[in-house]
Amino acid sequence: MAIQFRSLFPLALPGMLALLGWWWFFSRKKDRLSSNGKQVGTLKVGPAIEDRLPTEEACPGVLSVTPSVTQPPGKEEQRSMDRPLSDPPALPRTRQVRRRSESSGNLPSIVDTRLQAGQCSDENSKVVLSLMGDEAKSIPLGRPLFPKDLSFPYEAVEGCKQESALGRTPGRGWLSQCAASGENARETGGAEGTGDAVLGESVLEEGLLPQECVSEVEKSEFPILAPGGGGGEKVRSGPPQVDELLKKEEYIVGKLPSSFVGPVHSELVKDEGALVPQVKGSQDRSLARELDKDKTLPEKDQIEQTAFQIISQVILEATEEIRATTVGKTVAQVHPTPGTQPQGQEESCVPASQETSLGQEIPDPASTRTGATASPSAGAPPPKTYVSCLSSPLSGPTKDQKPKNSAHHISLAPCPPPVTPQRQSLDGASNPRGDDTFVTCTSNNSQSVLSVTSLGLCSDPVSTSRLEDSCTETISSSGDKAVTPPLPDSTEPFSNGVLKEELSDLGTEDGWTMDTEADHSGGSDGNSMDSVDSCCGLTKPDSPQTVQAGSNPKKVDLIIWEIEVPKHLVGRLIGKQGRYVSFLKQTSGAKIYISTLPYTQNIQICHIEGSQHHVDKALNLIGKKFKELNLTNIYAPPLPSLALPSLPMTSWLMLPDGITVEVIVVNQVNAGHLFVQQHTHPTFHALRSLDQQMYLCYSQPGIPTLPTPVEITVICAAPGADGAWWRAQVVASYEETNEVEIRYVDYGGYKRVKVDVLRQIRSDFVTLPFQGAEVLLDSVVPLSDDDHFSPEADAAMSEMTGNTALLAQVTSYSATGLPLIQLWSVVGDEVVLINRSLVERGLAQWVDSCYASL
């Protein structure tokens, strides 16, 4: 296909150019045939006065007359007229200055009047000024070259008078004032029909010659050739008051703004025989561009507003189409309300700097088209336009895809079926009809912007856990009063912003709610330790959307899986701009984010949350890319219940169920009651840094004490061993002795201390999860004749567990909620079960656990 295109393109392009050339040639020929009956004469001039004024040298030296003064052209003039426009003769000129007339809007009326009078000649008929004879010299441009009996049409005179008040270009001399007004009307008429304006010739742009200028013309001495004959008669008079008129002109021009005048560069070509003014096509196009730019400021603002509205509509229409295609639903389509807005409102959301006074009615084709589109006829179908009202053009999603706080009320509702938009006035905009919702957004500058949006909630089925992917709407009236439409009785209830029937696309596991989205939405930038080793409940309450819609989708238990990611693999796991994490979330359907630790940068946590199917799929994808990554779950599950006062479970680092982990015993209450730490957990390395910071902080005087009465379960800083300060929790209070019992949450153990020795703890010191896990030995109880373990049993337990790493596994939980564990010690190649060892030594007895095994 490409070879055929390359072979045909060189032939097609010349053919098209040739076809256009023939069409242009015959159309021009037809125009010349129709204009043969209308002849244009020229004014032949003789030698000019040699002493010219210095200020007149910068003015063009070509004059033109009105079509009403016509004479049969000579041979040389006929050849000049028959010459094609594409090859104009060279035009010797001095520096030519061209200006834009602010009263160009008056020209069409002049042209229409002249056309009705039958005085408008063809646009190709040009009046040329030929300098005949060997004694031809430059014409003094400061002098007009018209006879005294030359008549001007009244309409052209009036138009020229209006233009003369707007300004003149400095240095133009009398030529810009005394040129023929009829020629200006003729040339402008040609530009009106073809879109090009002829300005190459020296036509009348400024206005008619003032009365004193006419009197000076009558007194001037010029060799003027009669229109019919070849000779001429000379009229002598006294010298004119040229300097006075030039001063007047410069004074008027000096008062004009610089935007009214504009210099244009022209060519300087010298001809031997004759001076023939012609206008090139490039100059025509240049003038057309100048005339297009020559509009008032309100008109430009209107055009900018209309263009901004059209671009916004196109972009938002494409966005709505993509969303509608993704969700597989039909979005209700409505057209904008009529463009009649009260003062202080606009049709589009534009910055305040682009606003114009709405009290002014500016005729603009773009605004006319907008009005026609806004109120179509009843028979014609209205255009399908999607309009979104934004309080600011720069508003958009934040980096973490969370919606920004807004002053408007947010409501979620299912997408209604498409309705047929009807013509409606602005008065009824505040009262929506059918399923159409008219949204009024109020920006900071207190200007309401009215537009129409389609009522609906669209969600990405691939990312069901992202509330920010859903399309919510801001619904308010013109008085900024929130209006929440009642939810219709629909058989398609919502669950977390997703239709129930859409859950089948991802399987039945997608029905679980995601209330923890607000707690763990930080992604790779999250620094909250509460989301790293949290012990969240397995059952979550219904989301607000589910409660409103009254739906009860199938509940699926959440699986939380956390893996350690070394520092050198974190960047690859996140991907460039988070692309790989987004790919994992969209492909697996699970919620995945990376959590950083506050006191260490060597290891970070990858949190995976979702149904079993989603978690397995995510782990499979991660394992394929990172074969060296350990996918063991280090997440600590929650405890069923705790009889003892405790902190929220998001702050504790507990042992995982059914998984053997390495631990060290940091405190021993008795032979069967221990506190252990997971020294291989990534958060354990930050404990040493935390101890140093707390020591430096609480060694200084002036730290406030705990308020009295002391609240149970409060976290505080308490003195530890060897002058250290440790984190502790109050578990009991004794008001009669002003003492409390505390439990060290990191190093374990209970202690009874005075209240005044405790200190309030800083919030950043409780960020790290509590490292001490309180456990009980499983299947081991004291001897039958003792209520407590003997000192020998305690000593034997300390000997077997002291200063060594052990292996622990949670098998069940006690009635108080403490985990029951099996504890092993590794001696060389031999693994010893400490629970059994106590029994074999006669220090305890073995009993089958009365609790159900995990």
Swiss-Prot record:
Transit peptide, residues from-to: 1-29
Record flagged with keyword Phosphoprotein: yes
Modified residues (Phosphothreonine): T398, T484
Induction: By thyroid stimulating hormone (TSH) and cAMP or cAMP-analog.
Positions of region (PKA-RII subunit binding domain): 303-316
This protein's record includes keyword Membrane: yes
Any one of the GO BP annotations: negative regulation of dephosphorylation
Pfam families: KH_1, RII_binding_1, TUDOR
Amino acid composition bias (Polar residues), ranges on this chain: 338-359, 542-551
GO cellular component: cytoplasm; lipid droplet; membrane; mitochondrial crista; mitochondrial outer membrane; mitochondrion; neuromuscular junction; postsynaptic membrane
Classification via SMART domains: KH, TUDOR
Gene3D superfamilies attached to this UniProt entry: 2.30.30.140, 2.40.50.90, K Homology domain, type 1
One GO MF term attached to the UniProt entry: molecular adaptor activity
Tissue expression pattern: Testis specific.
Domain KH: 558-622
Biased segments, Basic and acidic residues type: 74-85
Subunit structure: Interacts with SLC8A3. Interacts with CFAP91. Interacts with CLPB. Interacts with NDUFS1.
Function statement: Binds to type I and II regulatory subunits of protein kinase A and anchors them to the cytoplasmic face of the mitochondrial outer membrane. Involved in mitochondrial-mediated antiviral innate immunity. Promotes translocation of NDUFS1 into mitochondria to regulate mitochondrial membrane respiratory chain NADH dehydrogenase (Complex I) activity.
Official protein name in the record: A-kinase anchor protein 1, mitochondrial
Organism of provenance: Rattus norvegicus
